[in-house]
């Protein structure tokens, strides 16, 4: 059992979106979750009460802004305000999943940049720092005028696949879309494996027309993406890989939303195993071949390092056994 963290000036609070990961983070950090209550009135309004003193403390609020996105976002904003009014020393937010991060640019005329709007709201509410996990677009960090620590899950995935023996030239890491090349290359470098990309003649509306850039024939393929939403991207990519001669297909994503009947889509796809982190607690049905890999130890270590003013750089890498550290 993890020993109790000595400094009692740091406090962790969990809101309602993902209590399981918050409990794991608290256990890994050796810091019990603070006492608070959150309730929603019949008219939809949210009321929060912090049931212990936070005066002069460094506060870390854990909340994934997943579905219901707007309720979870407002609960977070209200909790931030409660901490500020209770004279907390610093108010830091831990977002295992950052909702609205995909709305990071104007893709069509007269569209908003909602990720920037959310960043403005959180900053205006009075936060001092953001800790998050695998932002959809890393430039979202620049939407804040405060420190943002964007932790990477690729080292966790690399360690998992290395233990399963999925590495080397017999494995190919595949990006199911051209925007995910950097993520695929990062995992491939850890596994000493080649990469491949699934591209499309026009757009994603005709996924069956996708073609592969790279060699997957006779290899075990690992599809990697940041968000698993409806499952269609993975399902169609797996079919393309199967037609192209891949022997087995695995899939991995940082955030498993499993929205819109994703389980039905994925269970009919030729995918042996799907790995996601526990960044999102979903009420939707999850496919039987899904394995959850907890990001709680990574987040807990980041929180302690931030509090102790130590560097986070050791958290951004994984050194496979047998490799020279020199």
Curated annotation (Swiss-Prot):
<comment type="subunit">
    <text>Homohexamer.</text>
</comment>
<comment type="pathway">
    <text>Metabolic intermediate biosynthesis; 5-phospho-alpha-D-ribose 1-diphosphate biosynthesis; 5-phospho-alpha-D-ribose 1-diphosphate from D-ribose 5-phosphate (route I): step 1/1.</text>
</comment>
<dbReference type="GO" id="GO:0005737">
    <property type="term" value="C:cytoplasm"/>
</dbReference>
<feature type="binding site">
    <location>
        <begin position="102"/>
        <end position="103"/>
    </location>
    <ligand>
        <name>ATP</name>
    </ligand>
</feature>
<dbReference type="Pfam" id="PF13793">
    <property type="entry name" value="Pribosyltran_N"/>
</dbReference>
<keyword id="KW-0545">Nucleotide biosynthesis</keyword>
<dbReference type="InterPro" id="IPR000836">
    <property type="entry name" value="PRibTrfase_dom"/>
</dbReference>
<keyword id="KW-0963">Cytoplasm</keyword>
<dbReference type="InterPro" id="IPR000842">
    <property type="entry name" value="PRib_PP_synth_CS"/>
</dbReference>
<dbReference type="GO" id="GO:0006164">
    <property type="term" value="P:purine nucleotide biosynthetic process"/>
</dbReference>
<feature type="binding site">
    <location>
        <position position="136"/>
    </location>
    <ligand>
        <name>Mg(2+)</name>
    </ligand>
</feature>
<dbReference type="InterPro" id="IPR037515">
    <property type="entry name" value="Rib-P_diPkinase_bac"/>
</dbReference>
<keyword id="KW-0067">ATP-binding</keyword>
<dbReference type="InterPro" id="IPR029057">
    <property type="entry name" value="PRTase-like"/>
</dbReference>
<dbReference type="GO" id="GO:0002189">
    <property type="term" value="C:ribose phosphate diphosphokinase complex"/>
</dbReference>
<dbReference type="InterPro" id="IPR029099">
    <property type="entry name" value="Pribosyltran_N"/>
</dbReference>
<keyword id="KW-0460">Magnesium</keyword>
<dbReference type="GO" id="GO:0000287">
    <property type="term" value="F:magnesium ion binding"/>
</dbReference>
<protein>
    <recommendedName>
        <fullName>Putative ribose-phosphate pyrophosphokinase 2</fullName>
        <ecNumber>2.7.6.1</ecNumber>
    </recommendedName>
</protein>
<keyword id="KW-0479">Metal-binding</keyword>
<dbReference type="InterPro" id="IPR005946">
    <property type="entry name" value="Rib-P_diPkinase"/>
</dbReference>
<keyword id="KW-0547">Nucleotide-binding</keyword>
<feature type="binding site">
    <location>
        <position position="225"/>
    </location>
    <ligand>
        <name>D-ribose 5-phosphate</name>
    </ligand>
</feature>
<dbReference type="Pfam" id="PF14572">
    <property type="entry name" value="Pribosyl_synth"/>
</dbReference>
<feature type="binding site">
    <location>
        <begin position="43"/>
        <end position="45"/>
    </location>
    <ligand>
        <name>ATP</name>
    </ligand>
</feature>
<dbReference type="GO" id="GO:0009156">
    <property type="term" value="P:ribonucleoside monophosphate biosynthetic process"/>
</dbReference>
<dbReference type="GO" id="GO:0006015">
    <property type="term" value="P:5-phosphoribose 1-diphosphate biosynthetic process"/>
</dbReference>
<dbReference type="GO" id="GO:0005524">
    <property type="term" value="F:ATP binding"/>
</dbReference>
<dbReference type="GO" id="GO:0004749">
    <property type="term" value="F:ribose phosphate diphosphokinase activity"/>
</dbReference>
<comment type="function">
    <text>Involved in the biosynthesis of the central metabolite phospho-alpha-D-ribosyl-1-pyrophosphate (PRPP) via the transfer of pyrophosphoryl group from ATP to 1-hydroxyl of ribose-5-phosphate (Rib-5-P).</text>
</comment>
<keyword id="KW-0808">Transferase</keyword>
<comment type="similarity">
    <text>Belongs to the ribose-phosphate pyrophosphokinase family. Class I subfamily.</text>
</comment>
<dbReference type="GO" id="GO:0016301">
    <property type="term" value="F:kinase activity"/>
</dbReference>
<feature type="binding site">
    <location>
        <begin position="229"/>
        <end position="233"/>
    </location>
    <ligand>
        <name>D-ribose 5-phosphate</name>
    </ligand>
</feature>
<keyword id="KW-0418">Kinase</keyword>
